[in-house]
Design a protein with these regions (language model features):
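The serine-hydrolase catalytic nucleophile loop
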Residues: 88-99
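Short glycine/serine/threonine/alanine-rich loop segments
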Residues: 41, 107, 141
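A glycine/proline-hinged amphipathic helix-loop "lid/cap" segment
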Residues: 1-69
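Glycine- and small hydrophobic-enriched segments that form the cores of compact globular domains
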Residues: 84-85, 108, 131
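Short strand-loop-helix active-site module centered on a catalytic nucleophile
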Residues: 64, 79, 101, 122-170
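Conserved alpha/beta-hydrolase
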Residues: 98-119
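Short beta-strand element of the alpha/beta-hydrolase
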Residues: 75-84
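Short, small-residue-enriched loops and turns at beta-alpha junctions
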Residues: 86-88, 118-120
């Protein structure tokens, strides 16, 4: 495991020009237009851990994947919203994280492929997450929300609305 001090992350990203497409408004618009023309695949990597199973179904217009443990009984659920700054699709590291959570905790992990900018809105993503949490509660019992970057914002927004609706999560 490589541990990088936080103070080095920003300079390292600038050095490798990781976010060069998003440095200017014009660059961001070009990248979004290119991704609309040539979408990035969002399916799971060809190989994940051997101790999980991946399934997919439709939830309205969204593909929704579930990653379930195969070596132990599934207990509980996690609804995980991937990061990507609202413009980036789910990446291999998100799949690895979901598989690790499923295998090591026994939870069934739900991964929605929510619509990205310019095709979706934060409100649509939040509403979809709320419905997926309700479904996970019915199917898997106690359910937690998780997410990173844009997905963290989606998860937090959904959690606040669920709280306001009287839904108690672990």
């Amino acid at each position: 495991v490589l541990i990088v001090p936080n103070a080095l992350v920003g300079p390292a990203l600038r050095l490798i020009r990781a976010n060069r497409a998003f440095v200017s408004e014009a660059g961001a618009r070009r990248r979004i237009r290119e991704r609309a023309l040539r979408p990035v695949p969002y399916g799971p990597p060809a190989t994940l851990r051997p101790d999980v199973r991946v399934d997919v179904e439709r939830f309205g217009d969204w593909p929704v994947y579930t990653v379930s443990p195969t070596k132990r009984a599934a207990t509980g659920g996690v609804v995980y919203a991937h990061g990507g700054g609202w413009v980036g699709e789910i990446a291999p590291q998100h799949w690895v994280l979901a598989a690790t959570i499923a295998a090591e905790t026994g939870a069934t992990v739900t991964l929605p492929i929510y619509p990205l900018v310019p095709y979706g809105t934060a409100a649509e993503a939040q509403t979809g997450m709320i419905e997926l949490v309700r479904r996970s509660l019915d199917r898997h019992g106690p359910t937690v929300l998780a997410g990173d970057s844009a997905g963290g914002q989606i998860a937090l927004s959904a959690a606040l609305r669920l709280r306001d609706d009287g839904i108690v999560l672990p």
